Amino acid sequence: TDEEKDYVLDVVMKREYATGSIVNTEAGIGMDDRWKAKVFGLRYDDYTRLSAFANLNNLNENQTPGADGDWSPKKQTKGLLTTKQTGLNLNVNNSKKTFSLDQSTLLEWSDKNTVMQRRSETFSKDGSILGGTLSSNDLSDFTLTNNTFINQTLGRFLLSTGHHLVYTDQDDTSLSADSTYQTDIINTDHRRILSTSKRLFGNGHFGLSANLFGSGNTTSLYANYSFN
């Protein structure tokens, strides 16, 4: 009998078929002046993957998508959060797989408003004593987040570097009012606190790995840094 033979079919896709793009959009409005709009775009080929997005809403959501456009919602449970975001993700490789770049940048503007109100009543022989407390907080925040990772292989050497950078700019306004009264006001107190903060912080590394003798043993040297 003839022996059965195994055949392997090697298919190489033409470059024009390995290139594509995707665009997703979503928008809506609702009651109580609620609104949202977001868009995601992706362009890819054999060696490059580039995506960009924007997200605007006042629904207490600060969402960011993954590299494929899957949105992962995050909820702000208290107050009203208005968010404006835009971001970019870039992944680059070469045909020999000796170079890779992963780059992501996110810019976010947010305004958070929280209002709390409390009333109390204390009974006494001279009549009820009423109390009231009102507090509000307005926080405006800008955040820039940048991540860069690069790997380069040169013969037996692997060079790597990674950097994480964050810049924040915040304006915080707090108002509070306390009052106690019976037939007339007994006590009242009003406070207003303003604060501003700007901060730049980050961390990163530089690395060198070498397989000098080809035995599988690798020698590595890393330098790390951080600042705030």
What are these regions (language model features)?
Residues 1-33, 48-228:
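Primarily recognizes Gram-negative and organellar outer-membrane beta-barrels
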Residues 12-14, 37-43:
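Feature captures outer-membrane beta-barrel proteins of Gram-negative bacteria and organelles
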